[in-house]
Regions:
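Extended repeat-based scaffolds of very large eukaryotic assembly and lipid-transport proteins
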Residues: 1-206
Length: 206
């Protein structure tokens, strides 16, 4: 899968080559399973973001979500993912974790507890699932809009992701709010989403 299968740009191309090279360099006669795990864990702490993200995806396939969650929550310079990288990693790991059933979802919840911002587990789990129409009608729309004002980047990113998934705004309107922007630069975008929510506009069109 990792070498010849699905590609999830912009994270994977160089990481696949690094992964294949490291596997090929394993000593002859070594235990394949142990060698594979050694390579994945080494890539998980690599300085290159694409290698860390690729390892996070492979670990998530094994049912371990700590590395993925840590990367999704990172805010420090040099560790924080760019917007496209964040979206690609989230899409490659979190939906699958939720779709695998209660045990997998419980492991994901534990990863949010251990690696995510304090006190945000329930909100992050809800945003990772995405709201249904009944939840939007009963207040999830306001919750998502107010989450755009969160001090935590991962919360702002998830809130915007869910709002965009629901509303499907134009490219211009989608660009009004950038989660990574400084506080002052986010105010107008937040005001736009609040205005839309006040008009009952946070609803699916179909």
């Amino acid at each position: 899968w990792a070498i010849g299968g699905e590609r999830i740009e912009p994270l994977e191309r160089n990481a696949v080559e690094s992964f294949a090279t490291r596997l090929a360099a394993l000593p002859a006669g070594s235990d394949p399973a142990a060698g594979l795990e050694e390579v994945i864990l080494a890539m998980a702490i690599d300085r290159r973001v694409e290698n860390r993200a690729f390892a996070a995806i492979l670990l998530a396939l094994e049912g371990s979500y700590d590395v993925a969650v840590e990367m999704l929550c990172a805010e420090e310079p040099g560790r924080r993912l760019e917007g496209r990288q964040w979206s690609a990693l989230e899409a490659a790991t979190i939906p699958r974790a939720l779709a695998r059933g209660p045990e997998s979802a419980a492991r994901l919840r534990k990863a949010w507890e251990d690696r995510g911002p304090a006190g945000r587990v329930e909100l992050l789990m809800a945003m990772a699932r995405g709201p249904d129409d009944a939840e939007l009608a009963s207040g999830a729309d306001a919750t998502l809009v107010e989450a755009l004002g969160s001090p935590e980047l991962v919360v702002r990113r998830y809130a915007l992701k869910d709002l965009v998934d629901v509303v499907e705004p134009s490219v211009f309107d989608r660009a009004r709010f950038r989660p990574e922007a400084p506080d002052e630069a986010r105010r107008d975008g937040l005001a736009w989403w609040r205005s839309l929510q006040a008009k009952g506009g946070i609803r699916r069109s179909r």
